């Protein structure tokens, strides 16, 4: 592409893929494609091993961009999403805390990656040269981050969002214990159901009343079910995901919540899935990775704390 645009001639290329199950031979994958397209151009392999003094001088060097692995989570205006699912136009959070559209996406195979792990943020597998913003305000390569403090950016405060504190408490409770069901034959209509432990019913009913809602209560063997038939509530809750594994909080909502609203949402969630331990403080669980990190942002806004997010596999 660069050669065509500038009218230049390709002298050499450097493409290397360390052996793996998918590419046991370093000449496969992207290197094989280059060999097919440019059969007369030598591939110098691993750039770190090139003897630059023996190579012909060039006027223009074109390089690829550092990458993340496909499952890396990125905060979009709709919530955390795997980077492999993002498209041109998707609004993502920048290092300045602003939502900006993606102008171009790139997919390529890469070899070596390093793991970047920071409290309260998704773990990231990145190429060693990928830049990260650190506490000093400078950018540092991923491979040099040992012991550094990475800056976690919260979105700029958005436009004020509607809803009383009691309403946002119910949103938190929905994220913990709720699900949506469609009404057959009726578009954008449905029912929201909360499953509440029998010893937790009255505090939930108090919040429902304060929010101006009505719930139909039915008793099951181990819990109560609260059914809400208001279609506007159903449509609003669908935004947060229908079932446990799909739950998330859109980024624009995290940005627009006031401190009090964020506290109410967090309190509602903890009332359902939380557990207070005198030694460690509050803990909560979810099967949704995206929701876990979104709640960490809400907690940071509500209580000025940085959460630890841990993965725990159930015993076999």
Residue ranges and their predicted role:
Residues 95, 105-315:
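Intein-associated homing endonuclease modules of the LAGLIDADG/DOD-type, together
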Residues 83, 88-89, 102-104, 113:
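NTP-handling and nucleic-acid-processing catalytic cores
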Residues 72-77, 92, 114-118:
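A short beta-strand micro-motif
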Residues 72, 87-90, 130, 149:
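Surface-exposed loop/turn positions
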Residues 67-88:
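Protein maturation boundaries and topogenic segments
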Residues 93-101:
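Short coil-to-beta-strand transition motifs
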Residues 1-67:
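Conserved active-site and SAM-binding loop architecture
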Residues 15-18, 89, 268, 281-282:
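Catalytic palm active-site di-aspartate
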């Amino acid at each position: 592409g660069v050669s065509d645009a500038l009218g230049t001639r390709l002298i050499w290329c450097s493409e290397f893929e360390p052996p793996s199950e998918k590419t046991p031979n370093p000449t496969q994958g992207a290197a094989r494609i280059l060999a097919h397209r440019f059969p007369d151009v030598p591939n110098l392999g691993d750039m770190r091993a090139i003897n630059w003094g023996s190579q012909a001088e060039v006027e223009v060097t074109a390089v690829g961009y550092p990458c993340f692995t496909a499952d890396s989570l990125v905060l979009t205006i709709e919530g955390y999403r795997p980077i492999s699912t993002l498209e041109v136009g998707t609004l993502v959070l920048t290092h300045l805390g602003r939502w900006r559209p993606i102008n171009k996406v790139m997919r390529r195979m890469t070899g070596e990656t390093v793991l970047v792990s920071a409290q309260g943020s998704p773990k990231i597998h990145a190429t060693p040269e990928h830049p990260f913003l650190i506490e000093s305000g400078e950018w540092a390569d991923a491979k040099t981050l040992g012991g550094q403090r990475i800056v976690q950016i919260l979105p700029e405060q958005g436009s004020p969002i509607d809803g009383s504190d009691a309403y946002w408490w119910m949103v938190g409770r929905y994220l913990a214990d709720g699900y949506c069901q469609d009404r057959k034959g009726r578009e954008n209509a449905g029912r929201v159901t909360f499953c509440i432990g029998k010893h937790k019913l009255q505090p939930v009913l108090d919040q429902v009343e304060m929010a101006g809602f009505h719930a139909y209560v039915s008793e099951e063997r181990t819990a109560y079910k609260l059914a809400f038939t208001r279609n506007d509530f159903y449509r609003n809750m669908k935004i947060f995901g229908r079932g446990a594994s799909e739950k998330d909080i859109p980024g624009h909502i995290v940005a627009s919540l006031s401190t009090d609203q964020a506290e109410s949402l967090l309190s509602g969630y903890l009332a359902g899935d939380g557990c207070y331990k005198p030694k460690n403080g509050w803990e909560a669980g979810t099967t949704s990775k995206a929701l876990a990190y979104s709640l960490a942002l809400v907690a940071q806004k509500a209580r000025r704390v940085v959460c630890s997010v841990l993965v725990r596999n159930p015993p076999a």
